[in-house]
């Protein structure tokens, strides 16, 4: 499918207008461990963790005047440094670019709102959206796993992590997105094989995931 034409106002605009509570489910997987021992973290923090896939399923809610019930949006992101390194005292990435997959069932207005929602919920992580593509998005959430497929990105996350006492394992990061009660997950599959980010990756079998429900209350804002 052909990417949608990017509108400068979509990518560069200030905070979008939104109204009504938005609730749903979220999952992310990174190319870096989020739960590890200090010995592992100190050796990898500067060199990995520059990419991630984030996915949202909206159960109900209105954003930027658009009802988004049942729609999904996925962002594959890549930066020039570990995306979360600021949390452990490092310098934040100077850029984080995103390829965004929007639900092919959405209208043009809903697609724009889904991109804005992803930018809003990821709290400024994304500095530039380089491609927007409507696709069929799978977001399967079961008692044990969450599986997402969208375009050239996919991830499968097992809920929970198993760990031993070696190297004093601990949680080093927090989710990129707004999440009510985030939980740790074990990434079974995580890849992006598309174009637009000058990077492709596959990073399975890591303690590199977060998941959980998200919700936030609407605020009236004026659109630019």
Briefly describe each language-model feature range.
Residues 223-224:
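Short, solvent-exposed mixed-charge patches
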Residues 96-97, 101-217:
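Mature, soluble, non-transmembrane domains
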Residues 2, 73-75, 88, 114-118:
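Generic hydrophobic, helix-prone segments enriched in Leu/Val/Ile
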Residues 20-99:
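N-terminal Sec/ER secretory leader and immediately downstream segment
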Residues 1, 19-20:
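Absolute protein N-terminus
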Residues 14-16:
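N-terminal signal peptide c-region/cleavage motif recognized by signal peptidases
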Residues 1-7:
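Bacterial N-terminal signal peptides that target proteins for export
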């Amino acid at each position: 499918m052909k990417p949608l034409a990017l509108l400068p106002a979509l990518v560069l605009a200030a905070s979008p207008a939104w109204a009504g509570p938005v609730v749903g489910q979220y999952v992310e997987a990174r190319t870096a461990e989020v739960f590890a021992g200090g010995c592992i973290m100190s050796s990898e923090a500067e060199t990995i963790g520059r990419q991630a896939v984030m996915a949202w399923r909206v159960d109900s809610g209105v954003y930027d005047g658009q009802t988004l019930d049942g729609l999904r949006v996925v962002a594959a992101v890549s930066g020039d440094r570990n995306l979360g390194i600021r949390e452990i005292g490092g310098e934040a990435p100077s850029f984080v670019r995103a390829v965004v997959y929007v639900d092919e069932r959405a209208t043009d207005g809903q697609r724009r709102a889904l991109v804005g929602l992803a930018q809003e919920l990821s709290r400024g992580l994304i500095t530039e959206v380089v491609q927007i593509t409507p696709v069929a998005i799978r977001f399967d959430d079961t008692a044990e796993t969450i599986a997402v497929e969208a375009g050239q990105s996919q991830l499968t996350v097992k809920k929970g992590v198993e760990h031993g006492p070696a190297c004093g394992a601990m949680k080093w990061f927090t989710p990129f997105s707004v999440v009510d009660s985030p939980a740790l997950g074990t990434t079974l599959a995580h890849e992006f094989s598309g174009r637009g980010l000058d990077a492709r990756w596959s990073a399975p079998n890591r303690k590199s995931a977060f998941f959980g429900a998200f919700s936030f209350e609407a605020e009236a804002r004026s659109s630019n």
